[in-house]
């Protein structure tokens, strides 16, 4: 048994040696053949990019919520409408700035134009609605020192030697003149006062009328006075009126009387008196018409006052 096994081993070893030789010969022949290119290695697949959540995107009205979708084409920008094109609203030009005159008071200018100043009185005056506030402690007073006074109010209970007051004069202007040109002379009468110093001035329209206002200080009887003076050229119907208001107080009382004088200056108004609207006249031959099925109505009877029994 042992011999047989050894013989088998020799035979198996010979067979193995022969097989290896065949393999080597075959491999040698195969190595002489041209090498084929290796197959392409597939590229690694990248992980999909992380898309931010939709709730963090700002959605436009009518737009797409998908940030990767094609964006809509932008709306064409409308070209500006040229000035003066049909359908455009024309902006009225600003009025030219008013240049104050350097000489000649307002009254002097009107007289040079041949305009007559006719003083007006408050009784029966209806051409203009003039508002003059009356502060506490102030009363209407007669003042012979104010020529052609329309109304004068003053604080007779003040502590100053000088009585704080407001003077209003109204003139009807008879004659032809240019109100816009005339009002440029509104500063001159104040600027001629002794030691005049301007603190504020304006020629802006007042309640729609040409107007001038100038404020400042001047000297009178060894006192320094503080004053505000306004001129208004108002139109009522075919007539023109010069309305002038001056509010004056002692400089030492300017702070104490400030609320009162400010109330007068800021509350002053000049408005053209509006004529009452007239009811349209009935058509000739027309009669009052009643409700359907009723006889024509009669005009309403007047209010009757009951007579007490005798």
Swiss-Prot record:
Signal peptide boundaries: 1-32
Disulfide bond entries: none
Region of interest: Disordered: 278-310
Superkingdom classification of source: Bacteria
UniProt entry tagged with the keyword Cytoplasm: no
Alphabetical list of InterPro entries matching this protein: Lipoprotein_LpqN/LpqT-like
GO cellular-component term (any): extracellular region
UniProt keyword list: Signal
Keyword Signal among record annotations: yes
Family: To M.leprae ML0031.
Name this protein carries in UniProt: Proline-rich 28 kDa antigen
